Amino acid sequence: MKLIIFTGLVPFAIVSLIEAQAENEKACLPQYQVCTDAPGNCCSNLVCDCYGRYKSGTRIGRNCFCLQKGVIYKREN
């Protein structure tokens, strides 16, 4: 009887552990992906960098992207 209970509980415990681990390991956003709605989801070597969009001096929106930490981007003319 104990063997039947044990063999029933072991697969259940393994499946529960796998599901819990999958929830904790959410997929991170790779470089250059939009992170406006999820700023904490960039991969570990990236940071969610946000930029304001302006038209004729008036702010019209905001864009956020997963970019490399410590890298400065400059506009080219």
UniProtKB/Swiss-Prot annotation:
Subcellular location: Secreted
GO cellular component term, pick one: extracellular region
Residues annotated as signal peptide: 1-20
Expression tissues: Expressed by the venom gland.
InterPro entries linked: Spider_toxin_CSTX_knottin
PTM comment, free text: Contains 4 disulfide bonds.
Prosequence residues removed at maturation: 21-26
Coiled coil: none
Keyword Signal attributed: yes
One Gene Ontology term of the molecular function aspect: toxin activity
Keywords on record: Disulfide bond, Secreted, Signal, Toxin
Primary localization: secreted
Protein name: U8-lycotoxin-Ls1t
Organism ancestry: Eukaryota, Metazoa, Ecdysozoa, Arthropoda, Chelicerata
